[in-house]
Amino acid sequence: MIKEKVRVKIIAIDFNSRKGWKLYHNEDLYGNTEIADDRFWNDVQEGYYKFSKGTTLIADIKCPWKIEEPLKILKVHEVIYGD
């Protein structure tokens, strides 16, 4: 099913810097494609996503692209850009 608004749980590494993370879709579905949309990362930096319980980022993403369910985060790497 194609959805334009998806709720995603992202396991992050470092909440102290909160500068943005390099995320990857499920490898089987997307070949480890990086989520690189600037608007998403800008929203993360501006604090539009709710941080809760340790290293989990709860994000209601209104996607600028169409994606198929399920969207799963395979792995997360630390900050991809600085101040």
Task: Annotate each predicted stretch with a short phrase.
Residues 8, 48-71:
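Flexible glycine-rich surface loops and low-complexity tracts that mediate binding to linear polymers
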Residues 1-38:
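Long, positively charged binding patches that form subdomain-scale interaction surfaces
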Residues 12-14, 65, 80:
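A generic structural motif
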Residues 77-83:
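Short peripheral tails and domain-boundary helices/loops at the edges of structured domains
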Residues 40-47:
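Short alpha-helix capping/helix-loop boundary micro-motifs
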Residues 5, 73-76:
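Hydrophobic residues on conserved beta-strands that form the core of alpha/beta folds
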